[in-house]
C-alpha cells in the first residue's frame, strides 16, 4: 500500500526514466526546422561533418545525438515518407544507451532502430541488427536501406540461403548488417575454425540490436549453437530401451513414506521420470542384467530413462512432428519447426525409437556457444520487443540490460477481458467455437491462439464441421506464415495460430473492421509464460486501433492441472458451477497468473543454473579462441613458441624417466625409446653423463632443437613458418574438440556429486580447470610430436593450407547446423573414453583410474 502511494506521488522508476528522455526529445524537435530547410546535398554535408568529428575523436556519439537523430528523422521523411514520432525518438535513445526498449505491437520498432544504427555506424566499426528469421532480416534491411544509403552507409544481409563465405563476408564488411541470431552465431563458430585471418567473415563485435529480444535471449537461452561432426557410436541400446519402456506400467505419485505402485511415476512439474523398485526389477529381467544401476549398465539405465520420457512426457504434434520419417522438434515458444535441431542427451534417439523411424547417429561437438555468451561478447548490446517487463529481472541479472517501457504514440484502446474458466476441455472447446461463430456472423476478424499443433488441429476440425472458412498457421505450414498473418485482420477472417507464429508481421485493419470492434484475440489456454500471453494479446489494438482479447481456460489445461488447478477447482465447486458454465473472476485470473509466475521462476532458475555451468566452458572457449587468433596473426613468432614447447617437453619427459630426485639414476632405455618414437631423434646416454637435472633437461632440449632445425632445413623460412602455424592450429583444434567431449562427459555425471554432500558446480569448476590444464599441455606436447613426425616434400608443403581447409570444409558440411545441445554417450561408450577424461559413471575419478583400469597398457611409453 505504501509503495503504491509513493508511485502515485513520484511515479515509477520507468516513468522517471521516460521523463529524462522526453527532455532530450524537446531538444531534437527544436532542430527539425533547421534540417528541414536544407537541400539533400546540404543535409548530407552536415551529416558528414558529424561523422568526421566521430572518426577524429573530437566528439563522441552522445555529443552529437540530438543532431544525428534530427537528421535521421528528416532523412526518413524524404526517403520513406515516414517521420519518427517523439516516442520513437525515446526508443532510439534507449537502444543507444544499451538498454531494452519495450514497444507495443505496431509502434514501428523497425523504424526506431534506424536512429541508434546510424549513430553507432558512424565510427566505422559496424552495427549488427538481429531478427528471428530470414524473412524479417531481408524485409527490414530492404525497407530501411533508403535511409542508410542516403546517409552514405552500405547495408548487408546475412541469410541462411547464402552458401558461400564470400557473400557472408561482403555482408559483414558493410557498415550495417542484418541477419538472424543463428547465422551470426554459426559464422562466429565457423570463423574460429579457419586457418587464416583472410578467410574469416565477421569483424569485431561492436554494437548489436536484437529485435524480439525476449525470444532470442530468454526463450532460446537454453539452446546452444553447435557445430558437430559424425561419430561411430552404437545405437542398439535405444531400441532395447524402447521395447522395455513399452512394457512398463505407469503408477501414480504419492507422498513419502508411501511407496508408489506401478513401474514408474511421472513428475510433470520437473519433466522427469522416477523408476520404482518394482520397475527396476522388471527392467533388469527384461534387459537380462543383474543390476541396472551398476557402473557397467549406467548407459543402459540412462537410455531407459530417456525412453520413458519419450513415451510419457513428449507428445507427437505437440513437442515434435514426424515429417518424411524424421522426428522434428516443434519450438515451444513459436510453434515453428526447428529443422536441424535435435534434443540432447539421447532423447532424440529415444523419440526416433518410439516412432519406429531410423535412429540417427549421435554426434561429436566440434564447436558450440550459447546465445547468452555470444551476445555478451558485443561491446554494446541493446534489444527491442513488445514484451519484456515480466522478464526484467532476468535481463538485468544475466545481461546487465535495463528494460524501459516506451509509451504508445496513441493510447491503447484494446479491451483485455478477464479469463473464462470451464471445468473440462470439451466445454471450453465448444464455448470457443460459439464465440467464433458470433464474431464471424458480423464479420469481425478473429485470431485464435493455441499452444500446440494438436490443439490447432482440434479447432480446425470443429470449425470445418461448422462450415466456417478459416486459415491454420502452425509448424506444419509456416512457409505461408507472413501472408496468412497479413490477412488475419480482414472482414470475416478466422485464423488459428500456434503460439506466436507470425510474430514480427503486423495485422492491419480498415475502418469497417474498426467499427466492428477491431481484431478479436481468443487465447485457448494460458502459456507457461505471461509474456507469451501478452504477445498474443498485443496482436490486436495496434496504434490506437480498437480490439478485444480474452482467454478461455479449463481445469484440464496443463498449466492449471499441474500448478494451480486444485485451488481454482475448489472455488468453482464452492460457487456451484455446473457443466457447460464458466467462471469469470479477477481472483481466478490472479490465481492463474500466480501459477505462471511459479513456472517463470522455475525456468529462470534453470537458465541461470545452466549459465553458471556454461560460463566455465565459455571462459575456456574465449582463452582458446584468443590464442587461436594470435596464431593466425602473421606477426606472431611461432618459432619462439615451438622452442619454448621443446624446452617444456624436454623437462617434462626427462622428469618422467628419473628414478630419483638427484638425477643420478635415469631410465635411459625407455627415455631413448620415447624420444625416438615421438621425435624421430636418437640420443646417446654419453651426452648426459655427469650433468645435473637442469643441465640434462637443457641438453635434451638442445638436441631436439638441432634435430628439428636439420629436419626443416630444406624448406624456405616463409613456408616453414606457415607449416608450423597450420600444424599447430590443427593440433589445437583436435585437442579442443576432444576437450569439449570430455567436458560433456564431466557435465553428465557431475550431478551425482550432490549425493556425496558436494556442490556439483564447485566440483565442475575444479574438474574442468584440471582438464583445461591438461589441454594446454597436450597442445604444447602434441604439436611437438606432430612437427617432428610429419614428412612432406616441397609441393606438399605449399598445398598444406589448402588441404587443411578442405578437411575443415568436409567437417562443416557433415555438421549438424543446429542443436539443442550435444547428445549423450551411446552404449558401450566406456571403450571410447579418453584415458584422462572423467569416468562417465560420475565417480569423479579419471577414466584410467576407474573403468579404464582394465584397458590396454601403454608399454614403455607410458
From Swiss-Prot:
GO terms for biological process: intracellular protein transmembrane transport; protein import; protein targeting; protein transport by the Sec complex. Keywords: ATP-binding, Cell inner membrane, Cell membrane, Cytoplasm, Membrane, Metal-binding, Nucleotide-binding, Protein transport, Translocase, Translocation, Transport, Zinc. Zn(2+) binds at residues 839, 841, 850-851. One of its GO terms (cellular component) is cytosol. Its EC number is 7.4.2.8. Its main location: membrane. It is an enzyme of class 7 (translocase). Monomer and homodimer. Part of the essential Sec protein translocation apparatus which comprises SecA, SecYEG and auxiliary proteins SecDF-YajC and YidC. This is Protein translocase subunit SecA. It comes from Campylobacter jejuni subsp. doylei (strain ATCC BAA-1458 / RM4099 / 269.97).
Amino acid at each position: 500500500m505504501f509503495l503504491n502511494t509513493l508511485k502515485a506521488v513520484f511515479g515509477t522508476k520507468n516513468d522517471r526514466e521516460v521523463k529524462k528522455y522526453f527532455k532530450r526529445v524537446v531538444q531534437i524537435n527544436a532542430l527539425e526546422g533547421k534540417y528541414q530547410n536544407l537541400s539533400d546535398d546540404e543535409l548530407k554535408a552536415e551529416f558528414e561533418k558529424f561523422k568526421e568529428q566521430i572518426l577524429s575523436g573530437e566528439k563522441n556519439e552522445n555529443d552529437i545525438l540530438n543532431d544525428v537523430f534530427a537528421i535521421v528523422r528528416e532523412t526518413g521523411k524524404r526517403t520513406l515518407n515516414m517521420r519518427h514520432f517523439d516516442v520513437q525518438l525515446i526508443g532510439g535513445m534507449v537502444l543507444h544507451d544499451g538498454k531494452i526498449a519495450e514497444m507495443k505491437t505496431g509502434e514501428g520498432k523497425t523504424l526506431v532502430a534506424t536512429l541508434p544504427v546510424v549513430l553507432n555506424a558512424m565510427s566505422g566499426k559496424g552495427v549488427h541488427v538481429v531478427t528471428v528469421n530470414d524473412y524479417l532480416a531481408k524485409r527490414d534491411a530492404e525497407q530501411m536501406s533508403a535511409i542508410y544509403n542516403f546517409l552514405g552507409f552500405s547495408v548487408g544481409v546475412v541469410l541462411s540461403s547464402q552458401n558461400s563465405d564470400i557473400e557472408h563476408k561482403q555482408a559483414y564488411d558493410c557498415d550495417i548488417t542484418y541477419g538472424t541470431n543463428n547465422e551470426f552465431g554459426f559464422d562466429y563458430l565457423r570463423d574460429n575454425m579457419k586457418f587464416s585471418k583472410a578467410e574469416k567473415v565477421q569483424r569485431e563485435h561492436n554494437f548489436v540490436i536484437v529485435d524480439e529480444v525476449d525470444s532470442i535471449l530468454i526463450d532460446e537461452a537454453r539452446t546452444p549453437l553447435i557445430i558437430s561432426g559424425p561419430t561411430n557410436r552404437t545405437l542398439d541400446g535405444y531400441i532395447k530401451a524402447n521395447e522395455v519402456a513399452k512394457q512398463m506400467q505407469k503408477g501414480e505419485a504419492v507422498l513419502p513414506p508411501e511407496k508408489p505402485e506401478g513401474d514408474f511415476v511421472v513428475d510433470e512439474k520437473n519433466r522427469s521420470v522416477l523408476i520404482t523398485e518394482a520397475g527396476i526389477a522388471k527392467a533388469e529381467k527384461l534387459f537380462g542384467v543383474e543390476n541396472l544401476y551398476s557402473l557397467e549398465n549406467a548407459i543402459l539405465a540412462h537410455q531407459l530413462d530417456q525412453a520413458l520420457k519419450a513415451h510419457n512426457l513428449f507428445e507427437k504434434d505437440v513437442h515434435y512432428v514426424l515429417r518424411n520419417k524424421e522426428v522434428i522438434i516443434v519450438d515451444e515458444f513459436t510453434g515453428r519447426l526447428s529443422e536441424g535441431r535435435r534434443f540432447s542427451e539421447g532423447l532424440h534417439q529415444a523419440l526416433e525409437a518410439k516412432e519406429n523411424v531410423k535412429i540417427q547417429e549421435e554426434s561429436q561437438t566440434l564447436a558450440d556457444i550459447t546465445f547468452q555468451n555470444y551476445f555478451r561478447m558485443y561491446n554494446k548490446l541493446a534489444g527491442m520487443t513488445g514484451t519484456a517487463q515480466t522478464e526484467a529481472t532476468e535481463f538485468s541479472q544475466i545481461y546487465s540490460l535495463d528494460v524501459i517501457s516506451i509509451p504508445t504514440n496513441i493510447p491503447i484502446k484494446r479491451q483485455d477481458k478477464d479469463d473464462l474458466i470451464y471445468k473440462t476441455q470439451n466445454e471450453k472447446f465448444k464455448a470457443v467455437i460459439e464465440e467464433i461463430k458470433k464474431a464471424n456472423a458480423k464479420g469481425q476478424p478473429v485470431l485464435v491462439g493455441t499452444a500446440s499443433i494438436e490443439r490447432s488441429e482440434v479447432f480446425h476440425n470443429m470449425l470445418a464441421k461448422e462450415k466456417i472458412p478459416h486459415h491454420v498457421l502452425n509448424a506444419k505450414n509456416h512457409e505461408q506464415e507472413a501472408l496468412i498473418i497479413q490477412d488475419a485482420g480482414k472482414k470475416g477472417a478466422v485464423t488459428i495460430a500456434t503460439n506466436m507464429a507470425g510474430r514480427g508481421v503486423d495485422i492491419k485493419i480498415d475502418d469497417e473492421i474498426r467499427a466492428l470492434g477491431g481484431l478479436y484475440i481468443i487465447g485457448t489456454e494460458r502459456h507457461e509464460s505471461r509474456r507469451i500471453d501478452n504477445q498474443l494479446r498485443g496482436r490486436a489494438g495496434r496504434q490506437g486501433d480498437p480490439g478485444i482479447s480474452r482467454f478461455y481456460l479449463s481445469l484440464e489445461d496443463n498449466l492449471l492441472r499441474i500448478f494451480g488447478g486444485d485451488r481454482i477447482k475448489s472455488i468453482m465447486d464452492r460457487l456451484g458451477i455446473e457443466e457447460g458454465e464458466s467462471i469469470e473472476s479477477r481472483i481466478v485470473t490472479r490465481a492463474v497468473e500466480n501459477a505462471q509466475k511459479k513456472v517463470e521462476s522455475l525456468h529462470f532458475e534453470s537458465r541461470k543454473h545452466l549459465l553458471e555451468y556454461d560460463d566455465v566452458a565459455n571462459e575456456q572457449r574465449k582463452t582458446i579462441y584468443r590464442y587461436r587468433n594470435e596464431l593466425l596473426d602473421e606477426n606472431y613468432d611461432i618459432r619462439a613458441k615451438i622452442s619454448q614447447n621443446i624446452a617444456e617437453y624436454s623437462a617434462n619427459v626427462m622428469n618422467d624417466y628419473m628414478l630419483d630426485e638427484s638425477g643420478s639414476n635415469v631410465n635411459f632405455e625407455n627415455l631413448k625409446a620415447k624420444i625416438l618414437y615421438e621425435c624421430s631423434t636418437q640420443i646417446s646416454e654419453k651426452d648426459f653423463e655427469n650433468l645435473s637435472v637442469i643441465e640434462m633437461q637443457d641438453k635434451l632440449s638442445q638436441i631436439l632443437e638441432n634435430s628439428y632445425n636439420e629436419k626443416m632445413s630444406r624448406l624456405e623460412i616463409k613456408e616453414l613458418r606457415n607449416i608450423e602455424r597450420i600444424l599447430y592450429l590443427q593440433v589445437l583444434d583436435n585437442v579442443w574438440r576432444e576437450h569439449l567431449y570430455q567436458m560433456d562427459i564431466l557435465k553428465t555425471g557431475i550431478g551425482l556429486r550432490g549425493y556425496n554432500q558436494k556442490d556439483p558446480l564447485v566440483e565442475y569448476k575444479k574438474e574442468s580447470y584440471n582438464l583445461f590444464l591438461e589441454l594446454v599441455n597436450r597442445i604444447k606436447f602434441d604439436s611437438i610430436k606432430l612437427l617432428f613426425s610429419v614428412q612432406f616434400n616441397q609441393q606438399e608443403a605449399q598445398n598444406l593450407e589448402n588441404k587443411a581447409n578442405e578437411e575443415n570444409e568436409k567437417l562443416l558440411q557433415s555438421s549438424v547446423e543446429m542443436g539443442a545441445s550435444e547428445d549423450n554417450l551411446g552404449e558401450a561408450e566406456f571403450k571410447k573414453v579418453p584415458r584422462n577424461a572423467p569416468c562417465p559413471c560420475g565417480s569423479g575419478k579419471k577414466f584410467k583410474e576407474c573403468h579404464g583400469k582394465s584397458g590396454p597398457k601403454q608399454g614403455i611409453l607410458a
